[in-house]
Amino acid sequence: MADEVTIGFRFYPTEEELVSFYLRNQLEGRSDDSMHRVIPVLDVFEVEPSHLPNVAGVRCRGDAEQWFFFVPRQEREARGGRPSRTTGSGYWKATGSPGPVFSKDNKMIGAKKTMVFYTGKAPTGRKTKWKMNEYHAVDETVNASTIPKLRREFSLCRVYITTGSSRAFDRRPEGVLQTERMLTSDVAVAETSFRVESSLETSISGGEHIDVSMNTEFVDGLSEPMWDWEQLTWP
């Protein structure tokens, strides 16, 4: 009975909720079976993307668009090596620019990186429709006046399939989206610089080092921040 899915259940977390609640509780050892029935612990890089929907959280297994996982740090990474992003049929490769995740009060709470799955061997693999957002939380034990550090014990990964239409992640109930837009429009951010440094990062990648300069501008009357990424190094 405990594993039965509630009729009508939909999991539509915001990025802030993923980092500040779900990932934070997992890192602090406060997660339980009920949370893991939604977001299980799994090294997604050891599983073929097409198999991930079958091993997703019991309460989200019927979702045809997106799946969430807590991914533990690999042993090779803990020993100072680069984590593997290769499966039997292909590999995950970072794409685009990594970026910060902010809370509603404009506090940096984590970082997000996007990856795409390619079949075959690097660097000549064939791009697929499988994508992933990987989230890391900021280490809150570090003095706030110092350069933010990312915690590595676990990351939270959202795996999804690109369909050409708006992503499921952006199709939360209208009430939720309207509230977020109102909150976003109320935030006025002055020019800010921050840097995120941590130990080794991956994806067929090397060490992570983000140096970001952020400007808030308004374009076409929309209260959306535009980001100027400078000296960014996160392969």
From Swiss-Prot:
* Organism placement in taxonomy: Eukaryota, Viridiplantae, Streptophyta, Embryophyta, Tracheophyta
Provide this UniProt record's keywords sorted from A to Z: DNA-binding, Nucleus, Transcription, Transcription regulation
Localization (cell): Nucleus
Q: Which PROSITE patterns match?
A: NAC
The family database entries (Pfam families) matched by this protein are listed as: NAM
Q: What protein name is recorded for this chain?
A: NAC domain-containing protein 90
Q: What GO terms fall under cellular component here?
A: nucleus
Give the comment on domains. Answer: The NAC domain includes a DNA-binding domain and a dimerization domain.
> GO molecular function, one example?
DNA-binding transcription factor activity
Q: Where is the NAC domain?
A: 5-162
Enumerate the PANTHER family for this protein: LOW QUALITY PROTEIN: NAC DOMAIN-CONTAINING PROTEIN 90-LIKE (PTHR31744:SF220), PROTEIN CUP-SHAPED COTYLEDON 2-RELATED (PTHR31744)
| Source taxon at top rank | Eukaryota
